[in-house]
Amino acid sequence: MSQEFAHLSVLLEETVGGLNIKDDGIYIDGTFGRGGHSRQVLQRLGENGRLIAIDRDPQAIEAAKQFADDPRFQIVHGGFGQLADYVEELGLVGKIDGVLLDLGVSSPQLDDAERGFSFLRDGPLDMRMDNSQGETAAQWLARAEIEDMAWVFKTYGEEKNARHIARCIAADRDKTPFLRTKDLADLIARITKNKERNKHPATRVFQAIRIYINSELDQIDQALEGALTVLAPQGRLSIISFHSLEDRIVKRFIRRHSQGESVPHGLPITEDQINKSRKLRAIGKAIMPSDEEIERNARARSSVLRIAERLDY
């Protein structure tokens, strides 16, 4: 792998440690990326263990060839939202000992201008995690209604100036279509008055478009529900989020399945019956990166790790 696009896995020890790996366990790395977490899992697995990695980025599939000679490893080209389907095809539902998810965009994707994820590097306005299929960011911006753009910017980017930015994009695109990341970033920088300190004005809009183009939050919802289906009793869920939208979904999911079903007050029901509706147990509190890790890898700053265990009921 090129050093230019090298990737440092965030919260590596904590995330893999949270899986509580067994020698002969079966694990899923739902976001293979460049293999940092997978490598750590394989180092802890015994010879009878198994790791199933998933990624929809063709470059990640290419990077997975580094483990081609390891019989314990296999890679699946697809989105992690479909992990339950892949596990079912393998006949392993209820036998998975741990699921790891490292959400968001990877450093190699950000650093490669040709992928179109970064407003700091000029490149084609693409933003697809799987650049072999689907609509690009440029294609969406060329056709989207003002209301649709404003909704995406507000909902997925928490952008305060969503409507104003959407109107300006619509006004400009008829004269000059937005085909490059620099075109879009420069427009947003030019029209944004109240700029946030230490944050590029295009940050929230780029995040919003990326999330929308790749259906990222839907993928997370599907992956969490799928993980609950495939995990064995005492199986672990270890998830890294990078912004509040992701972490909110993960936190609420763990809380909902840790508390069990809500029961109307006064209904004659035993504690044992309530316990049987609980499917997860949160393991500790949310874990943040240390100051030392942030110093080594600035992109770790916003990361949050949450770990949960499948209950045996």
Swiss-Prot record:
Pfam families according to UniProt: Methyltransf_5 (PF01795)
Annotated localization: Cytoplasm
Enzyme superclass (EC): transferase
Keywords: Cytoplasm, Methyltransferase, rRNA processing, S-adenosyl-L-methionine, Transferase
Catalytic activity: cytidine(1402) in 16S rRNA + S-adenosyl-L-methionine = N(4)-methylcytidine(1402) in 16S rRNA + S-adenosyl-L-homocysteine + H(+)
List of residues binding S-adenosyl-L-methionine: 35-37, 55, 80, 102, 109
GO CC, alphabetical: cytoplasm
Disulfide bonds: none
Predominant localisation class: cytoplasm
EC number: 2.1.1.199
One example GO MF annotation: rRNA (cytosine-N4-)-methyltransferase activity
Origin: domain of life: Bacteria
SUPFAM superfamilies xrefs: Putative methyltransferase TM0872, insert domain, S-adenosyl-L-methionine-dependent methyltransferases
Gene Ontology process terms (BP): rRNA base methylation
Cross-referenced InterPro entries: RsmH (IPR002903), SAM-dep_MeTrfase_MraW_recog (IPR023397), SAM-dependent_MTases_sf (IPR029063)
Biological function: Specifically methylates the N4 position of cytidine in position 1402 (C1402) of 16S rRNA.
HAMAP family: 16SrRNA_methyltr_H
Similarity-based family: Belongs to the methyltransferase superfamily. RsmH family.
Protein name, per record: Ribosomal RNA small subunit methyltransferase H
Biological source species: Shewanella sp. (strain MR-4)
